[in-house]
């Protein structure tokens, strides 16, 4: 049975990164893909469950494309698109970035859950 797509939340950081890396059309395709396949990205160690997906860019393919960092908890929360970067910019998140993501994840869960209960 097909499940409905997951809601996507684009963070300010992701939007800034995406604006310089990904066209509007490619961003829409990315969002549709992640919404339908929220577990597609590989888990990044030491981040509390943050994932990274390789996204092909026109003329560059997956290996020269963008890396999109996102968090998916479960179907009760949206997918949070956190950041994006070109493979030519860096290979992986730094330890400081991984630590920041690990601190961000519980805050996302708590803040979103509290906001949902208030409605």
Describe the role of every protein-language-model region:
Residues 4, 72-119:
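Enriched for short, Lys/Arg-rich terminal
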Residues 10, 30, 47-51:
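A generic structural signal for short beta-strands and their flanking turns/coil linkers
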Residues 13, 22-42:
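Compact soluble domain cores
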């Amino acid at each position: 049975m097909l499940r409905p797509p997951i809601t996507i939340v684009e963070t300010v950081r992701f939007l800034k990164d995406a604006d310089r890396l990904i066209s509007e059309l490619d961003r829409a395709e990315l969002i549709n893909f992640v919404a339908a396949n929220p577990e597609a990205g590989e888990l990044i160690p030491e981040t509390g469950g943050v994932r990274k997906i390789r996204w092909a860019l026109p003329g560059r393919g997956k290996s020269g494309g963008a890396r999109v960092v996102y968090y998916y908890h479960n179907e009760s929360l949206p997918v949070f698109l956190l950041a994006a970067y070109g493979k030519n910019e860096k290979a992986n998140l730094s330890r400081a970035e991984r630590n920041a993501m690990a601190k961000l994840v519980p805050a996302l869960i708590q803040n979103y859950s509290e906001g949902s209960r208030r409605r």
